[in-house]
């Protein structure tokens, strides 16, 4: 009698535990099928955006729209991506293939990225756009985005981002902030 109860308990546990594991595996396989070789990019945090009801502007480089680009991630180049760069959080944002989820790319593994016609390279703790590059010198631009003073508009207080641009001229391995 006790053996039957133990046997039934083992069967019950087997079905209860293995069923969800099998389901998770099929979801993982489906994700890899859709993402393909680009799955490595889609393994980080979901982006928490900026509500237009709270902020009067955005902290993204140039525009808050996604632009076609490429990322050199862990030594591999991934092309035909929709990207935007958040200068406040210093995060590259990528949109998944089905265009439903916005994800932050793990910046520790990013060697460089290209958005539109601008190439971004590491500069201290952020990324800078290359404006001019030659064997003699390089001119880059980066943005030190910070939270500015609140703005009142129609009796409603909004927060705003200040995005002062900084330019760096590099010559003979020495950086000069312009």
Write out the residue ranges for each language-model feature:
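Generic detection of intrinsically disordered/low-complexity segments and helix-coil linkers/edges
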Residues: 1, 9, 25, 32, ...
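Bacterial Sec-dependent N-terminal signal peptides
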Residues: 1-27
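Hydrophobic alpha-helical segments, principally membrane-spanning helices and signal/leader peptides
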Residues: 4, 42, 101-102
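Hydrophobic transmembrane signal anchors and adjacent membrane-proximal interface regions, especially
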Residues: 18, 46-48, 52, 156, ...
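General N-terminal leader/first-domain-start detector
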Residues: 22-80
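Aromatic-patch recognition
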Residues: 69-178
């Amino acid at each position: 009698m006790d053996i039957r109860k133990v046997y039934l308990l083992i069967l019950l546990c087997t079905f209860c535990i293995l069923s969800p594991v099998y389901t998770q595996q099929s979801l993982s396989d489906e994700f890899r099928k859709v993402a393909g070789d680009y799955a490595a990019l889609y393994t980080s945090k979901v982006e928490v955006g900026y509500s237009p009801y709270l902020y009067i502007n955005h902290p993204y480089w140039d525009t808050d729209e996604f632009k076609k680009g490429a990322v050199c991630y862990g030594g591999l180049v991934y092309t035909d991506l929709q990207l935007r760069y958040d200068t406040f959080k210093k995060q590259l944002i990528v949109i998944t293939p089905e265009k439903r989820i916005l994800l932050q790319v793990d910046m520790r593994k990013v060697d460089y990225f290209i958005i539109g016609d601008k190439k971004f390279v590491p500069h201290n703790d952020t990324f800078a756009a290359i404006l001019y590059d030659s064997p003699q010198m390089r001119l880059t631009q980066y943005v030190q985005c910070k939270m500015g003073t609140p703005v009142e508009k129609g009796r409603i207080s909004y927060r705003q981002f200040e995005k002062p641009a900084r330019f760096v001229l590099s010559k003979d391995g020495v950086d000069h902030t312009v």
